[in-house]
Amino acid sequence: MFIEQRIYTAHPGKLPAWLKLYEEVGGPCSVRHLGPPIGFFTVEFGTINRVLFVRGFDDIDDRERQLAAREADPEWVRFRTETAKIGALAVQETKLLKTVPFSPVQKAGQAFERKIGGTGLVVDHRTYDFHPGKMNGWIEAYERIGLPVQQRLLGQLLFFGVTECGPINQVVFAWAYEGLGDRDRRRNTMAADPGWAEFMKTVGQLGPLKQQTTMVLKPTAFSAIR
């Protein structure tokens, strides 16, 4: 399946008003035509005054038809008009991902099933950029060695995809935790695990990574993942 990831950066002080309009007008209209998003978040750590949301498509041609239907909806026109009045958004970014076989999300509209304890939730969103020709070897080693360790010790993997349109030689994935303390404790345990040391040694010999970027996200009140 395909995952479209969008990141919108707002001018300082303008994001709450934009989110309110999206929750009340733009979001319901989008769900009506595009189906529910996988998740909708604000950035807690990273570049702030940002929202990040992801939506799945089983057929990429469906996306074009669904977007056209939304553009013709009076409620979407209303949303665009009202958000233009407040001038909230400074930058909009989008990229298209394809899920890997071990991604938990494999179908558009797939319902989120919470598998972690507690009532809170934060998301560790990660983007890894690779030297050309090195990504597939890293993914193979990750699926075989690294992922089993993380599934045993970390929180809940939400999705995992490779960039199809946008910066290529890139993977994007996200893990959910009960909170920042939960994340820290689990990652410290992982770092001390012999299985993780084996993974790091294996991928270290490949020399695949060019850059790693992480953000901490918080779900909005209307996010399916929460």
Residue ranges and their predicted role:
Residues 1-198, 202-226:
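Short S/T/G/P-rich N-terminal loop/turn motif that feeds into the first structured element of a domain
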